[in-house]
């Protein structure tokens, strides 16, 4: 592993452990040349994914871009970073296990929205507003109406 500080290839793993859900290995490393310490993460990649953009352009799937967009929708929400990582890992696992190497950006957006809807309503609305390109207040009202309908359909816990 190349040192991010001095670009030396002479690094050493000092500590290695799985994350809570065991889907990622976290490694603490030290550069022998400059003594810089850094962390790397190792995860399984089932297949190389290609995203087909709305304009037809093909780009390699970028997990970090997915993480950033989920984090933006969850900004200032009471969701732990570990939960975000679990959510992103679940989305990537779903994409990789679909059997398709080429996936449309629309499909990815719908999968992200499904996962966010289960996690946090506010994050879901935020993501939907960008993904679906909301232009008017009625666009928000429609999504909020969907969420309200789901809330009414869910059984409520009655306390005595």
From Swiss-Prot:
The keyword Transmembrane does not apply. Residues 1-11 have a biased composition (Polar residues). Binds 1 zinc ion. GO terms for molecular function: ATP binding; DNA binding; zinc ion binding. Keywords: ATP-binding, DNA-binding, Metal-binding, Nucleotide-binding, Repressor, Transcription, Transcription regulation, Zinc, Zinc-finger. A zinc finger (unnamed) spans 3-34. GO terms for biological process: negative regulation of DNA-templated transcription. Residues 49-139 form the ATP-cone domain. The keyword ATP-binding applies. Its cofactor is Zn(2+). Residues 1-20 are annotated as: Disordered. It comes from the Bacteria. Pfam families: ATP-cone (PF03477), Zn_ribbon_NrdR (PF22811). Belongs to the NrdR family. Negatively regulates transcription of bacterial ribonucleotide reductase nrd genes and operons by binding to NrdR-boxes. HAMAP family: NrdR (MF_00440). This is Transcriptional repressor NrdR. It comes from Rhodopseudomonas palustris (strain BisB5).
């Amino acid at each position: 592993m190349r040192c991010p500080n001095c670009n030396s290839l002479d690094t050493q793993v000092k500590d290695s452990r799985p994350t809570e859900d065991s889907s990622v290995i976290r490694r603490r490393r030290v550069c022998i040349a400059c003594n810089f310490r850094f962390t790397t993460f190792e995860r399984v990649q089932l297949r190389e994914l290609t995203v087909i953009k709305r304009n037809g352009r093909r780009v390699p799937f970028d997990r970090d871009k997915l993480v950033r967009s989920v984090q933006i929708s969850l900004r200032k929400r009471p969701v732990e970073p570990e939960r975000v990582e679990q959510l992103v890992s679940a989305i990537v696992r779903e994409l990789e296990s679909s059997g398709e190497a080429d996936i449309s950006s629309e499909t990815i957006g719908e999968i992200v929205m499904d996962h966010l809807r289960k996690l946090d309503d506010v994050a879901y609305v935020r993501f939907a507003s960008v993904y679906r390109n909301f232009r008017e207040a009625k666009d928000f009202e429609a999504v909020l109406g969907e969420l309200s309908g789901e809330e009414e359909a869910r059984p409520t816990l009655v306390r005595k």
